[in-house]
């Protein structure tokens, strides 16, 4: 479970995410593909809209972080998409590293916000990995 403090901090970032979300996610993809070129294969065929789609997902997550049941359908859809693209648990730390670096570069928000986003990312990653494991095991 996420701490109340993390939830408060994440929710406080929603206005900044609405303003700079696509800039953050575009930078995250730049970092990810330059540091870990093999990850580009996971996004083969993804549209140019992918940074905007991810930004919208992050904004929704931050907005509903205190009511995650509101995102159950969206999280299930993301998990199915990840399985189609062959996303594995070992990819999550790479994305986390690049996302946190992008947040730091674009927003320069300070340690409290970065720590909260790290905790929130880990929580969501664990949820997705669990769902994806079930999907991968289905015939």
Curated annotation (Swiss-Prot):
Belongs to the globin family. The keyword Transport applies. Gene3D superfamilies: Globins. InterPro entries: Globin (IPR000971), Globin-like_sf (IPR009050), Globin/Proto (IPR012292). The keyword DNA-binding does not apply. This is Uncharacterized globin-like protein aq_211. It comes from Aquifex aeolicus (strain VF5). One of its GO terms (molecular function) is oxygen binding. PANTHER family: FLAVOHEMOPROTEIN. Residues 1-133 form the Globin domain. Keywords: Heme, Iron, Metal-binding, Oxygen transport, Transport.
């Amino acid at each position: 479970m996420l701490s109340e403090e993390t939830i408060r901090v994440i929710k406080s970032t929603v206005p900044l995410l609405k303003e700079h979300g696509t800039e953050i996610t575009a930078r995250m993809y730049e970092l990810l593909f330059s540091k870990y070129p093999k990850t580009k294969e996971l996004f083969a065929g993804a549209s140019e809209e992918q940074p905007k789609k991810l930004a919208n997902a992050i904004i929704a997550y931050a907005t509903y972080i205190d009511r995650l049941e509101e995102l159950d359908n969206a999280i299930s859809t993301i998990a199915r998409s990840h399985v189609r693209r062959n996303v594995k648990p070992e990819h999550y730390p790479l994305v986390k590293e690049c996302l946190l670096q992008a947040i730091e570069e674009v927003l320069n928000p300070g340690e409290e916000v970065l720590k909260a986003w790290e905790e929130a990312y880990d929580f969501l990653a664990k949820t997705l990995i669990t769902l994806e494991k079930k999907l991968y095991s289905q015939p």
